Amino acid sequence: MFTNAMQLKGWIKNKSKQTGIHPNELLQNFVLERLLERVSLSPYRENIILKGGFLIAAMVGVDKRTTMDMDTTIKGLPVNREEIGKIMVEIVSINIDDGVAFEIQNIKNIHEVSEYDDFRISILALLYKIKVNNKFPRRRAAGY
């Protein structure tokens, strides 16, 4: 992992030259990977199902597909603003000594009227002195 912002910026610059992917997209992807690492270390790793563009990028490679958010479905847990807030605070509080800190900015309903509760969580990632905004849509799985 990186020990300072200069190392991270250098890695992103080199990766951008190699892949042709815009540096901001690479930075966003890096931040989402750091968040996903925390999810995988949390007690909720079996309840949060990754889907969408970030899952595809993980399967086929970032050079084939980039995404600006992490789309998930929740199974086996109550899905309401308060519970989602508690879960996300717990997840982003996991320290894995990677130089990344997360702050929950807000939690909003994605749809006014929907069969299931669904939320968009805006998260600010702090990498040394670099700030990156993220969106983390959460939905309840059908039948749970």
Which residue ranges define each predicted feature?
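Compositionally biased terminal segments of proteins
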Residues: 1-144
